[in-house]
């Protein structure tokens, strides 16, 4: 049988692990362990080389939800090279396995380098939600809008607006107190 994941308290109290962990956090290899039960982890434009770090981050942060705002396998540019669909599938499977191994909810929004038919087929028996266009969701009383680009969320903004794609529009709070992240 597979041993259970250590609790946050066990991670913090193990002296050897704590010392190694501290070194890894300082080196930027791991995020600090926190209790993220009420947290959303927003990611976007993830190259497959980032998947191992993403797995560690998810396990250590333990978010309630993961929202990916597109370009799931950003190192495979299907928009430019559609012949790489098999490679995209292979790398996408790694990401989907990573997400399905976790206990948090996940929303994936397609980006310009994603292939919706492949994504839908690969998630048909999964709890992962796939959105082909911008949308809204609520967590408690907090209203979120999520899309692949800033333009996807700016006109019909929620309290918290999640987007990726490029860095032309940095994180900001507008005059109405709405967050753009």
Name every feature range the model reports, one short phrase each:
Residues 33-36, 59-61, 100-101, 138-140, ...:
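Flexible, charged surface loops at secondary-structure boundaries
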Residues 29-31, 56-57, 97, 134-135, ...:
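Short, flexible, glycine/charge-rich loop motifs used to bind or transfer phosphoryl groups or to couple energy/partner
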Residues 134, 138, 145-181:
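Conserved beta-sheet core of the metallophosphoesterase superfamily
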Residues 48-134:
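Core catalytic region of metal-dependent phosphoesterases/phosphodiesterases
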Residues 1-88:
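N-terminal active-site segment of His-dependent metallophosphoesterases
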Residues 39, 115, 143-145:
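Short beta-strand micro-motifs in enzyme catalytic cores
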Residues 38, 64, 104, 128, ...:
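A structural micro-motif
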Residues 42-45, 66-71, 106-112, 146-148, ...:
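Active-site neighborhood of phospho(di)ester-bond hydrolases with catalytic His/Asp-centered motifs
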């Amino acid at each position: 049988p597979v041993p259970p994941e250590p609790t946050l308290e066990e991670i913090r109290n193990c002296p050897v692990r704590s010392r190694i962990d501290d070194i890894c956090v300082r080196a930027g290899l791991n995020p600090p362990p926190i209790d993220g039960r009420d947290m959303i982890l927003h990611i976007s434009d993830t190259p497959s080389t980032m998947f191992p770090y993403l797995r560690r981050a998810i396990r250590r942060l333990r978010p309630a939800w993961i929202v990916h705002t597109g370009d799931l396998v950003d190192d495979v540019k299907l928009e430019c090279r559609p012949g790489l669909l098999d490679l995209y599938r292979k790398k996408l499977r790694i990401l989907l396995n990573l997400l399905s191994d976790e206990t948090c909810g996940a929303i994936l929004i397609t980006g310009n380098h994603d292939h919706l038919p492949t994504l839908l087929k690969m998630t048909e028996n999964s709890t992962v939600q796939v959105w082909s266009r911008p949308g809204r969701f609520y967590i408690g009383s907090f209203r979120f809008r999520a899309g692949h680009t800033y333009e996807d969320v700016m006109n019909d903004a929620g309290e918290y607006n999640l987007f990726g794609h490029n860095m032309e529009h940095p994180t900001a709070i507008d005059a109405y107190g709405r967050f753009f992240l």
